[in-house]
Regions:
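Bacterial Sec-dependent N-terminal signal peptides
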Residues: 2-9
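Non-catalytic interaction/Regulatory regions outside core domains
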Residues: 12, 25, 34-39, 371-378, ...
């Protein structure tokens, strides 16, 4: 039995690489609205106490999402999610929702609606359209796709455009489903520069879909030269007990020493654009499953002092990472995790047959609910740089030369990682189980 008005909402959250200029009309869809011009966030906005507190809450969400998703991941393969992509898609959903549905989403994000409205623009502008010297690129795109039969409130569309930098499209999911799905597929492929190209199969009952895409690409150095490999091969201990003989990439020195705990050790390398690749390496007697927890992820990403120097001796410390090339990905539905671990339940309840059902009346008077939260990622780290994220540059001393102690941090077993921007906003987080 079908309910014409009780149409499901599909939230599509994607993370990976690519951006192509969006045309005003896409085959299978019509542009209803476009975001206001993006003005880069100012230094004052980025260091404001309220925004710093907001990003701390976002990073708590990021650590929990990465850990919970990995806990439910049974593929045994390399794994990564993009917490900022999921966070942004849920923020768009919160703006479209009302009542208890909105409250549940905001509770999962640990913010009030006022906090979200006041800070999401700064967060977006700190990430979107970050292009440096034509070599570094970080791009985020928000969009909402509305079925032609769905009546929407213009005030909500305007808020999405102005506060969330969101494109709005009309597509005929009901009467020309193939064309509508084709438009969504091309949009995601274009915005991710071909890294994500899949058929999502949004049904003819789709009232609207919320889509976030993220693309990051950076090099290790200004000249674009490859990172050198080690002269010798290392035995990389895969999570399944096998060993792969491989040469490791030799990262540049960064100030500080390896952060060590009883369970794991951590350090980072950087890209040309100051994106950071942070490694979480299990110590002997522990596995990556043991140490890739929300608490440990948050601790490592919150580190600001790696002990760069010893003032009493004037000694400067520097460490470089030896690490393998790797690829990671994810393709799944996060709805179950969001319900079980984050308490977002009403969003997924059908108004046709469930009490306490989804309320999207800020966007539309038609009853609607969410059927899935599709999340797809692709990430590659190699000798050229990162498509997804990366890190670079060694801090220099000030004044007279200082004695320097140099260390090597060898990543020779299955490990966890975090990829962030220069302000430690998590773009990707995951686990490399094997190479």
């Amino acid at each position: 039995m079908k309910f014409r008005l009780r149409k499901p909402l599909a939230i599509l959250s994607c993370a990976a690489a690519g951006v192509i200029t969006l045309s005003a009309c896409n085959f299978g869809s019509t542009l209803l609205g476009k975001p206001q011009k993006v003005v880069p966030a100012s230094h004052g906005e980025l260091i404001a106490d309220e925004f710093v507190a907001f990003t701390q809450k976002e990073e708590t969400f990021a650590a929990k999402l990465a850990a919970c998703t990995y806990e439910n991941y049974d593929g045994g393969e390399n794994f990564t999610v993009s917490p900022i992509s999921v966070y942004t898609a849920l923020s768009l959903a919160a703006e479209c929702a009302a009542g208890d549905t909105r409250d549940e989403i905001l509770s999962a994000l640990s913010v009030t609606h006022t906090e979200l409205k006041k800070n999401i623009s700064t967060l977006y502008r700190s990430l979107a359209n970050d292009v440096r010297d034509g070599l570094t690129l970080l791009d985020m795109t928000n969009s909402i796709w509305v079925d032609e039969s769905t009546q929407v409130n213009k005030s909500c569309i305007d808020a999405l455009s102005n506060d969330y930098y969101c494109y709005s499209y009309s597509a005929n999911f009901k009467k020309d489903n193939a064309a509508a799905n084709g438009a969504v597929r091309r949009f995601v492929k274009d915005r991710t520069r071909g890294l994500i190209d899949k058929e999502y199969g949004l049904s003819d009952e789709t009232a609207f879909a919320i889509i976030n895409t993220l693309y990051l690409k950076d090099l290790w150095n200004l000249t674009g030269n490859d990172l050198p490999f080690t002269d010798e091969e290392y035995g990389f201990n895969n999570a399944d007990g096998s060993v792969t003989q491989t040469k490791l990439l030799t990262g540049y020195y960064n100030g500080g020493k390896v952060y060590e705990t009883d369970e794991y050790s951590a350090f980072y390398t950087k890209t040309l654009g100051s994106y950071k690749l942070k490694f979480i390496l299990p110590n002997d007697g522990y596995t990556v499953d043991d140490i890739f927890t929300a608490e440990n992820i948050a601790t490592v990403n919150g580190l600001t002092d790696y002990g760069n120097s010893a003032p009493e001796s004037g000694t400067y410390y520097a460490t470089r990472c030896f690490f393998p090339e790797f690829k990671c990905g994810y393709d799944g539905d996060l709805a179950g995790i969001l319900k079980e671990k984050f308490g977002i339940e009403r969003l997924f309840k059908n108004p046709a047959n469930e009490s306490g059902a989804c309320d999207f009346f800020t966007l539309t008077s038609s009853p609607a609910y969410c059927t899935a939260v599709y999340h797809t990622t692709e990430l590659a780290v190699d000798k050229k740089g990162i498509e997804g994220a990366a890190g670079t540059i060694m801090p220099g001393g000030d004044g007279a030369p200082q004695p320097t102690e140099k260390y090597d941090f060898v990543i020779d077993r299955a490990f966890g990682f975090i990829i962030t921007d220069s302000r430690d906003i998590t773009l990707f987080s995951g686990v490399v189980n094997k190479i």
